[in-house]
Amino acid sequence: MQQKRIIVDCMGGDHAPGEMLAGAVAAKAALGGEYLLVGVRAEMESAARARSIDLSAFELRDAGSVIGMEDDPMCVLHAKKDSSMAVALRALRDGEGDAVVSTGNTGALFTGASLIVRRMQGIHRAAIATVLAFEKPTLLMDSGANVTVQPDFLPQFAVMGSAYMKGLFGIEMPRVGLLNNGTEACPCRRRRTACCPGCPVSGLSGMSSRMPCRLTCVMSRSRTALRAISA
């Protein structure tokens, strides 16, 4: 099996680039694979010397700037298109790796992933996915970035989440729940209807035309509700 190649934005997040370099070293030791480290080369090399990290097993790519947490998300496309995040995303788009890892500005990463890498055919809106630390593997889809979504986005989120759970955890038919931010009976019937079991998912090229799951509609903000979905 061909080794996966991970592209790492080494300038995002707290204590970068040192922490990202240390993480790449740990990941390579534990999981193998190849890693492309993107960042301001002088800063990466300085951080590596300070931590006695050997970078000889990694490919380094220089970037001209860094996107800060306070920056406008659109800067990844314009003002800071030479940033480590933008360079990493373009490398993924151009087929130089299998995934990008970044702990930087979430809005910029979401924007760049959608408009540089682009979405899969048939997916109209990207969604942030968060694995929750419950007894059973649980994935919370659309856990940030999207303020409002259209009803037809929800089945697409379900398909993407189901594919993730099958690929990562080997769950053939994940249980999908619709979690509402509120306690009213059903604030948006159209959204609930769009996610009904067996609802045709149109326009998803290469994917199943029907939902491979059972719907659970949970109306609560609580952790208990999330546990109900994962049960």
Predicted regions and their residues:
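N-terminal phosphate-binding or glycine-rich loops at protein starts, especially the Walker A/P-loop
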Residues: 1-45
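Short, glycine-rich nucleotide/cofactor-binding loops
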Residues: 6-18, 77, 145-155
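Short glycine/serine/threonine-rich phosphate/pyrophosphate-binding segments
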Residues: 15-20, 82-95, 99-113, 120, ...
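Glycine-rich phosphate/diphosphate-binding loop of Rossmann-like nucleotide-binding domains
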Residues: 18, 34-36, 42, 147-206, ...
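Short helix-capping segments at alpha-helix termini
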Residues: 29-31, 49-57, 169, 196-201
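Phosphate/nucleotide-donor binding subsite
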Residues: 53-97
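Glycine-rich phosphate-binding loop
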Residues: 91-110, 184, 191-231
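Short, acidic/small-residue loops that bind anionic groups at enzyme active sites
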Residues: 110-144, 199-208
